[in-house]
Amino acid sequence: MLQLSHYPSAIAQAAQRVNEVDSQLMAVQHQINRFEGNADRISAFESDLKNDAQRKARRFEVLLVNQEYQKSMDTLIRLTAEKQNAIAHLEYLRNQFSVAKLEARLAIVQQLNDFEARELVGL
């Protein structure tokens, strides 16, 4: 457990990590959207595709062979898990900070009670 005075900076660092991962996630999602838009464009303008089901199948084929798209999807999955872990760590630090503050308050109350008890006894 950290010292009480170290929690705010640790919490700020953990929140910054969540923001960094979130930023990376948005960049990867933007890249995925571009790949999907390109696949939509390719499938929309192929004249031999006669219905929506054929266009969807062609879109799927285009995305399936795109290695960059596959890498981006893997990165998206990894970053999503990383973000969830970062959020869990942030919440853990916040909860630890709350517990540390309560323990500090309890220690102060116990010291005051001990002091008052000694005064009553006349020590």
Outline where the language-model segments fall.
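Short, charge-rich amphipathic alpha-helices with coiled-coil/heptad character
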Residues: M1-E20
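Long amphipathic alpha-helical coiled-coil segments
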Residues: D22, Q29-E36, K71-I108
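Extended alpha-helical coiled-coil "stalk/arm" regions
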Residues: Q24-L63
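Short acidic DE-rich linear segments
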Residues: E116-L123
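Intrinsically disordered, low-complexity acidic Ser/Thr-rich regulatory segments
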Residues: R59-L76
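Generic detector of low-complexity/intrinsically disordered segments
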Residues: V65-N66, A104, G122
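N-proximal short alpha-helices
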Residues: M1, S5, D52-R55, R59, ...
